[in-house]
Regions:
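Tandem repeat scaffolds
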Residues: 1-193
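Long, ordered, amphipathic alpha-helical scaffolds
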Residues: 171-255
Length: 255
């Protein structure tokens, strides 16, 4: 059974079922159409590795492993395990990978790109996303900060479906350029004014008022926010969304 090692290029190889790599540097390696099985990286440095159409579902990263200038393309990264704060990915590219179940929240990503990857329903810490670029559809992702943490990311080429921003500053984030996305500033001040006047709106039913208040209160701590108005309309209806942005004193058509 083959192990990962530096300077090799292999296609459709069978790797050892469970392989432990400790304090190793592995570089300049290309793996294609292979099941890497269950590698455990303990304080390792991976540099300029290429995984193309590979299965890494059982990979584990621990003890300050670093992954630099690596490319993951059309690969299965589901359930890849990362110890909390024990892996740093720098200048890595992820393209058309399945990352659902991968413990992304435990790793730090610096200058990385994610293109058309699937990592639905994950919480990403803003402090661990540094100058990264995302492209494609993001579904049910939460970007979370500590209240003033800047999210330094480029999501210009993304569609945001069910994406939430909690406790993070979006001033350094490049918002989506695609249709139906709206970037709003001074959100907390807008919310405060909206909540003060919401009882004066005679067109609101009790049900809609409750939903509107709940939706606004979720934004009380945010200075900026990015909305996908089309997604909101699919959930709440066009009339409600129109009223929501009216109370925020901004138009959903100003995109």
């Amino acid at each position: 059974m083959r192990r990962l090692e530096s300077g090799i290029s292999v296609d459709n190889e069978t790797f050892s079922d469970v392989a432990r790599y400790e304090n190793e540097t592995i570089s300049r390696t290309t793996i294609i159409n292979s099941n890497i099985r269950s590698p455990i990286f303990w304080s390792c440095h991976l540099d300029h590795l290429v995984f193309d159409t590979c299965d890494l579902t059982n990979a584990r990263f621990f003890a300050g492993s670093t992954i630099d200038h690596c490319t993951f393309s059309h690969s299965d990264l589901r359930s890849v395990g990362i110890g909390k704060n024990e892996a740093v990915f720098t200048n890595c590219e992820f393209s058309s990978c399945d990352m659902r179940g991968m413990t992304l929240e435990n790793a730090t990503f610096i200058d990385c790109t994610f293109s058309n990857c699937r990592f639905n329903d994950r919480v990403l810490q803003a402090v661990n996303i540094v100058n990264c670029t995302f492209a494609g559809k993001l579904i049910d992702i939460t970007f979370e900060g500590n209240g003033k943490q800047k999210l330094i990311a480029n999501i210009e080429n993304c569609t945001l479906d069910g994406v939430r921003f909690i406790g993070c500053d979006l001033a350094a984030c490049i918002p989506p350029a695609s249709k139906n996305h709206l970037y709003v500033e001074h959100v907390s001040a807008r919310v405060k004014k909206a909540l003060e006047k919401i009882d004066d709106d005679p067109t609101l039913s009790d049900h809609d008022r409750k939903i509107l208040v709940r939706s606004l209160r979720k934004l009380e701590q945010m200075e900026q926010y990015i909305f996908n108005t089309k997604y909101m309309e699919n959930i709440h209806g066009a009339a409600f969304v129109e009223r929501f942005f009216s109370h925020l004193r901004c138009s959903k058509d100003q995109m």
